[in-house]
Amino acid sequence: MNIDEILNKSRAGDVLSREDLICLLSLRPDCPETYKVFAEANRISKKVSNGKAEVHAQFAVNLAPCNCGCLFCSFARVNGVFSTAKELSHEQAVDYARQFEGEGANAVFMMSTAQFPFERFLEIAMEVRKGLKPETTLIANVGDQSLRNAVKLKEAGFAGVYHALRLREGIDTHLTVESRKKSIFDFKEAGLEVGTCVEPVGLEHTNAELAEMIEFTASFNPSYSGAARRISIPGTKIARRGMISELRMAQIVAVTRLGMPQTVIGNCTHEPCTLGAIAGANLFWAEVGANPRDIEAKTEEGRGETVNNCRSIFQESNWDLWYGPSRYYNRGHKRSEQNAAWSDFSAALQSRR
């Protein structure tokens, strides 16, 4: 099948096969056909989000060496970037959250390292929730959790979570594919919306691996999917593998959008860039505090972007902005029509396996 036939399938609302996704991923990032893929992804993203992009903002409640062995992460003890543990006070956490709320972030994310005590995370979260407006969307970015803990997150006032099955999970990490998937499904069972991503993409990942991960993220109807490249942590073993270009990342962002059902409104990329936005990304993150892609303890002094900078990148890419609580994490008002559309997509996806 040629590229135009695949794009015509997308325009008709048909589910792309894994072979279709591999075909699109196999194009040279700078060839004319890839720019056609960008245009189609941009069209879909603007259609499902009414042309309005979102900026979410994340702060870390702690910084500590972690034993989960994620080779791409600056928190990993094996990488030796950070050697001491630090934790925000309740007041500092509330201040960060209010800062993001005041700057107009569409969702406020609380992140912890994977082994941070869950009950302590909840204690901080409850103070943060009390300090925010009721309508502010609060999201958790935590390690794998049981269904019981997922319910506690929901009860504490979280609308959703960010959670991903990472590329080569269990090879480049000490975690298992099964534990990551179980957490995703437990979060959903608890009533939390789940945002995810195809990440962290490196030069070594094959088009078949990427297509399989795109299909997996589509399979559970996330709040958003998307793609993010691996950022090299200086001095680490995995940094020797190199990094993909922003253009290649934008290509993967675009193909991921084409692989999602249109019930998925969001299409993310990280780190924020105009190429990603042109290729259909409608979600960026601002960050403060610890950041798993940064060697600075305060990423606002390193790689982290601000809410305003993220907005400017979108505007430079001809996106309008959404003001108000995140639509990606608050899909309930459209649940009935979404369920019907999702059922059709899911059935088509299963029939192609």
Q: Model-derived features: where do they sit?
A:
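Generic structural signal for hydrophobic
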Residues: 100, 128, 153, 184-187, ...
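Alpha-helix N-cap and loop-to-helix initiation/capping positions
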Residues: 88, 92, 120, 175-179, ...
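Auxiliary Fe-S-binding modules of radical SAM enzymes
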Residues: 1-29, 218-353
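Conserved C-terminal portion of the radical SAM core fold
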Residues: 160, 176-238, 253-267
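Catalytic cores of alpha/beta
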Residues: 146-153, 203-217, 270-279
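Core AdoMet radical
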Residues: 61, 77-184, 193-200, 223-226
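N-terminal [4Fe-4S]-dependent radical SAM core
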Residues: 20-71, 75-84
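Helix C-cap/helix->beta junction micro-motif
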Residues: 48, 132-134, 190, 220, ...
